[in-house]
Structure formats: C-alpha cells, structure tokens
A protein has these predicted regions:
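Generic structural hydrophobic/aromatic packing signal, biased to beta-strands
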Residues: 35-37, 82-84, 105-109
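N-terminal topogenic membrane-targeting module
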Residues: 1-71
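Short, surface-exposed loop/turn segments at beta-strand-coil junctions that are enriched for proline
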Residues: 87-97
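Residue-level signal for secondary-structure boundary sites
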Residues: 28, 45, 90-92, 113-117
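Acidic, serine/threonine- and proline-rich intrinsically disordered appendage/tail regions
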Residues: 1, 60-66, 70-77, 95-144
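Short Pro-Gly-centered flexible turn/kink motifs
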Residues: 74-88
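Solvent-exposed residues in well-ordered beta-strands and their adjoining turns
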Residues: 23-25, 40-42, 85-89, 110-112
C-alpha cells in the first residue's frame, strides 16, 4: 500500500488517495469484472464528517464511479487506486478530523476465469495516524 496522500483540500473537505497492489497468483489469466470499496464508519462512532470512496485501476483512473473491467495476467502486478472524499460538518475540516478514528474498509472484487466467478474481499484500515500524517504533510507544504 502506498502512503496516504492529500490530492485536494479546502476549508470544508479533503480528498485523499492511495494505491493497493494486486497480483494474480493463479495458474491462468483472470478478469476483475467488478470492484468497490465499503467503508465502516457508522455515525454512532463518528458523526463529524462523511466519507465517500471511489475505486479504479491505478493505470486507468476514472472519476465517474464506473468500474472498467480489466484482465489480470499471471504474476504481473497491477494496483487499485482508492480515493477518499471526506466532507466535514462544521465548516472546518481540520477541526472535524481531529478525533477521526481508525476506519476499516473492505475492497470487494469479482473475479472471472475459467471456473465460476467469485467475489473476494480484502480488509484494510485507514489509521488516524496515517490521516494525521497526510494532513500534516499537505498543510506544512502549503504554508511554505
């Protein structure tokens, strides 16, 4: 996983991104027909911001929410690009994210090969420390 990076930020929201490597370890090529990310941040746990996530192939990014299927060659690495749009509720995104908790996310993808298709799931966690580090690096760079 690449480090979390701020793509854009204004007073009320922030867009962050990172990539996750994927490799076909099977014995034949396969196709990723569908993929999406589900975040686990219920408002009972954290209600100061809302999170929207998009997932695309890193080498062919899209911003329309459409998943473009791609072929996975055997042992040839590719990467998923994950973008998080976080919108604060108070009008000050930095204040809203001060106590942002660790946020689990599932990457769910449909694989098709010669056998029947199946869904696979990988869980990753966006830690509050990773978020603070990305925000600090961005805001300190903006001030220079």
């Amino acid at each position: 996983m690449t480090p979390l990076k701020v793509e854009d930020m204004d007073r009320e929201s922030v867009v962050l991104s990172f990539t996750i490597p994927i490799v076909n370890t099977g014995r034949q090529i396969g196709t990723i027909m569908d993929a999406f990310v589900r975040t686990y941040l219920p408002f009972e746990q954290y209600d100061k911001a809302s999170v929207t996530v998009t997932l695309t192939a890193a080498d062919t990014p899209r911003d329309d929410g459409y998943w473009q299927a791609f072929i996975m060659e055997i042992r040839k690495p590719k990467a998923f690009l994950i973008k998080l749009a976080i919108k604060g509720k108070s009008g000050n995104i930095l204040r809203d994210l001060e106590n942002f908790p660790d946020m689990p996310m599932d990457i769910i993808y449909q694989v098709v090969a010669r056998s029947d298709y199946y869904y696979a799931k990988t869980r990753i966690t966006l830690t509050s420390e990773d978020l603070r580090t990305a925000l600090y690096q961005y805001t300190s760079g903006v001030r220079k």
